[in-house]
Design a protein with these regions (language model features):
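N-proximal low-complexity "stem/linker" segments adjacent to membrane-targeting elements
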Residues: 1-25
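A short acidic, amphipathic alpha-helical/loop segment
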Residues: 18-22, 47, 78, 103-105
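Acidic donor-binding segment of Leloir-type glycosyltransferases
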Residues: 20-65
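Solvent-exposed polar/charged
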Residues: 25, 81-82
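Conserved acidic residues
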Residues: 31, 61, 84-86, 94, ...
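Short, acidic/glycine-rich phosphate-metal binding loop used to engage nucleotide
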Residues: 64-72
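Catalytic-site signature of metal-activated, phosphate-bearing donor transferases
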Residues: 73-80, 87, 96-208
């Protein structure tokens, strides 16, 4: 079994660096990393050039450019089209997986013959206030995690029937069977943000 780790990135060089450091060193040699780049950011290009040159003989890293054009589903579907793995693990550039999640995901897939695995996600927003939470209907636990386990449809079979739909707040279709990982930190994605980035994203989403 091999997995394609599909990443969408836009002007997130520091976040991409952290994510790639984990994927390069914790995934298997037969796995690949597929990166869809929106925009023309020099810092992102520098990170990608650095990783592809340093690890070209150890890891298959595919990079291509595509304009988002206010359609997140189309962007993610383009990632699917560029993947060759048996399964696809989609990760946004500002997320990163717990290392134990990466080490156990193939065992999970072997034990659960399903089309889709839902992954819990740890969301944190630096600078968030009670007023923000009330405004957006969010809840925060005693660890500062927002809406946990906030399950995400991220690991799925590569199939012509499985795709993303809706330009914003996109969701996946075509999966007939699925499983949820336990709501445990070591099996989660991390999604850290600042309140400034969150508000900027909310404003952008409202234009789509």
């Amino acid at each position: 079994m091999n997995i394609s780790y599909g990443i969408t990135v836009c002007n997130e060089a520091d976040e991409l660096n952290k994510l790639l450091e984990i994927l390069i060193h914790k995934t298997d040699k037969e796995d690949e990393i597929v990166i869809c780049v929106d925009g023309d950011d020099d810092a992102v290009r520098f990170e990608l050039d650095s990783f592809t040159q340093k690890y070209f003989d150890k890891k298959t890293i595919k990079v291509y450019q595509r304009t988002l054009d206010k359609d997140f589903a189309a962007q993610k579907n383009s990632v699917i089209e560029n993947c060759r793995g048996d399964y696809i693990f989609h990760i946004d550039a500002d997320e990163y997986p717990h290392k134990i999640l990466i080490s156990q995901i193939k065992q999970v897939l072997e034990m659960n013959e399903v089309d889709l695995v839902w992954i819990p996600r740890v969301n944190t927003v630096e600078g968030i206030t009670d007023e923000h939470c009330a405004k957006w209907g969010w809840r925060i636990n005693d660890k500062g995690w927002i809406n946990y386990p906030d399950y995400q449809a991220r690991v799925f079979k590569r199939s012509k029937d499985i795709k993303w739909i809706k330009p914003v707040h996109e969701y996946i279709t075509g999966c007939k069977t699925y499983a949820h990982l336990p709501a445990q930190e070591e099996l989660s994605l991390y999604h850290p943000k600042t309140i400034e980035k969150q508000e900027k994203q909310n404003e952008f989403y409202s234009t789509i």
